[in-house]
Design a protein with these regions (language model features):
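N-terminal topogenic membrane-targeting module
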Residues: 17-36
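A short interface-forming secondary-structure element
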Residues: 48-63
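Short beta-strand elements
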Residues: 35-37, 78-88
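N-terminal presequence-like segments and adjacent domain-start helices
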Residues: 1-19
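Polar/charged, Gly/Pro-rich intrinsically disordered segments
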Residues: 83-131
Length: 131
């Protein structure tokens, strides 16, 4: 899916790397705009957290999330012809906003991650924390 090759080497009867951990670490390294990423195995969902270092109105956030969803739907429509599920929540803490974006792992692609981070960078510019 992401083009990463998983190694399944045994060391003393144990697997040396776990593919899920490798995937999460790779996402954080390849996309420094992602502050943290969490995987929920039960729901097969990824939650990506982004930090914006300025106050953002609810109206502005809702407009951006709508634009993000439309962009992802268009991207996946062109790539696979399928609609995808997206959920977003935001937490405001003074002059800082934490944006949580949830997606199903099975339909997520590397191109989609690039699109998400590019749209966030375009919208929030220097205020988007890059780690």
């Amino acid at each position: 899916m992401f083009g990463f090759k998983w190694k399944n080497q045994q060391a003393g009867g144990r697997q040396t790397t776990q593919p899920g951990i490798q995937l999460l670490a790779s996402m954080l390294v390849c996309y420094p705009e992602i502050e943290s990423v969490t995987y929920e195995p039960k729901d097969t969902e990824l939650t990506m957290d982004f930090i914006v270092s300025r106050a953002v109105s609810q109206q502005e956030l809702e407009g951006f999330v709508k634009f993000l969803d439309e962009s992802l739907q268009t991207y996946h429509s062109l790539e696979t012809g399928q609609a995808v599920w997206l959920a977003a929540e935001a937490e405001a803490h003074g002059e800082t906003v934490l944006l949580h974006i949830r997606r199903q792992l099975q339909t997520m692609t590397r191109g989609e991650l690039t699109l998400i981070t590019a749209l966030l960078s375009d919208k929030f510019g220097e205020q988007l924390k890059v780690d």
